[in-house]
Swiss-Prot record:
GO terms for molecular function: large ribosomal subunit rRNA binding; structural constituent of ribosome. Belongs to the universal ribosomal protein uL14 family. This is Large ribosomal subunit protein uL14c. The gene is rpl14. Binds to 23S rRNA. It is found in: Plastid, Apicoplast. HAMAP family: Ribosomal_uL14. GO terms for cellular component: apicoplast; mitochondrial large ribosomal subunit. Part of the 50S ribosomal subunit. It comes from Toxoplasma gondii.
């Protein structure tokens, strides 16, 4: 779990590099867990991005630095907090997803996100 008001790296090819989380939309809590949807502000972009600095976006949390028990006997620790940018209808804004994707996220109802995934733990 991670708290709100923290930075998340974006792991898709939208051109956004880093966002700052404002609100947890999935549940009314200041803690953020994987599979949560957050509201964030863009803090860092690449120079050819179609997004603007300080634009408000939605993000689907994929990876956290906190130790997670994804399967019953394995614990996973990632190096960064990462999100995938989505729109209001939960469709991904990018066309590719970079990095590892935990297996417990495959079981959710986000079929369009699951179809873009290449590396599954």
């Amino acid at each position: 779990m991670t708290q709100l008001n923290s930075f998340f790296y974006v792991s898709d090819n939208t051109g956004v590099k880093k966002i700052f989380s404002i609100q947890n939309i999935t549940r009314n809590s200041f803690l953020v867990n994987t599979t949560d949807i957050i509201l964030g502000i863009i803090k860092e972009i690449s120079f050819k991005s179609s997004f603007k600095y300080s634009e408000i976006v939605y993000g689907f949390v994929v990876r956290l630095k906190k130790t997670q028990n994804i399967q019953n006997r394995y614990n996973y620790i990632f190096n960064e907090n990462a999100v995938i940018l989505i729109d209001k209808n939960f469709n991904p804004l990018g066309t590719r997803i970079f990095g590892l994707f935990p297996e417990n996220l495959k079981n959710n109802n986000y079929l369009k996100l699951n179809s873009l995934v290449l590396n599954i733990i």
